[in-house]
Amino acid sequence: MICIIDLGTSKVSSILIDDAAKMTVKAFSSVETQGIKKGSIINIGATSDSIADSIRDLEMQSGEKIKEVNVAFSGEQISSTNSNGPVVIGQKEVTASDIQDALRISSTMKVPSDKTLLSVMPIEYIVDGQPGISDPMGMNGVRLEARTHLVYCSQNTKNNISKCVEEINNLKINKYFFNQLGAAECTLTNDQKELGICLIDIGAGTTDLTVYRGGSICFSKVLPNAGDYITESIAVNLKIPSYQAEEIKKKYGCAVADLASDEQLKITDVSSGNETTVSRVVLAEIVQQALTNILRYCINTIEENGLKEHIPAGYVVTGGTANLEGIKKLGDQMTQSSFSIGLPIINRPQKSDQLIKPQFSAIVGLVHFYAQEQNKEFTFNQSKGIIGQIVEWIKSEL
């Protein structure tokens, strides 16, 4: 059994699978939480309770006792960078040891001393100046270089997660993940990743941005404004409580004012306590402005990092905010590029229909991501191949 927990700002989701390779869902749970803000734990007790409730749901559905979990998270505390690891190999064939050395050097060159490594993802290898090599094993050369994408977070972040999961709930954490890796795994095709594409995952607390090119991740960034920012804009402009703003956003929100009807919605003014009405057009104008700010931030980030010309496949948006009516039209207008909504790609096994929603892209994709890593480890450990050795080294480093 494999259990994955996704710690989101608005919810703690967990999934239990009994066959990762076939994506057979044994149980799934999603529980609201008040203990996380913008991806960071702000209340140990509340977060622990949400985790406990979610795990309890899984155990009741499956009849299994869960002892070990894999934890995925995002948040402003996550950073990333691209790094290089050069090694001199002499005039000989590239060996597993050479590749491990290159990866090790790349993973230690740019990670700040107060951070801890979360993921090491090879972008490409370069042998004697020749780029674009996915597997240099056995090639002849003098100099090998590994180009990698590193994702890291503060040690305190891991400590707080460990406290909620291991100390309070008595569960063992097997692996930590940056949840955006999962979202990309089940919403993007290999062709899109090869050509060059940007994935925008707009959750409740943060917007996660990743770019894939040449089949590999080459850029990632966590941005501070997301679904809660839209909710706050509605609450402030209409002078209503946040919970009511969230409710009407989900039920009546529209990303393009021109698409909204003139239906009148009942709301309660928080200042006077009096009931009043607002049209869906006015609501849509507020939503459109807030979402425009979020997407503009994403587009500017892509342009500022020189990536605009490297994403000919355009943009894919996922996460809970992708459920907003009209978001594709707004994205098309703003990017002047291909802009689509990313849904989890699964084999539609029993109990999984509820997962085919943008808000569950990360946790569904993490199942695929985890299964791939396990398959690599098994296959190459059996043959003592390079990937198995690299996976083993990365696990020991993380």
Each predicted region: which residue ranges?
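Nucleotide/phosphate-binding catalytic cleft detector across ATP-hydrolyzing
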Residues: 1-11, 15-199, 216-218, 227, ...
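Extended, folded domain segments that form the structural surfaces/walls around functional sites
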Residues: 6, 189, 201, 293, ...
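Short glycine/serine/threonine-rich phosphate/pyrophosphate-binding segments
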Residues: 12, 184-185, 202-210, 324-325
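Gly/Ser/Thr-rich active-site loops/lids in small-molecule metabolic enzymes
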Residues: 95, 223-236, 328, 335-342
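A short beta-alpha structural unit
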Residues: 186, 313-320
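Glycine-rich phosphate-binding loop of actin/hexokinase-like ATP-binding domains
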Residues: 195-237
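Nucleotide-binding motor/catalytic cores of P-loop/tubulin-like NTPases across gene-expression machines
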Residues: 317-368
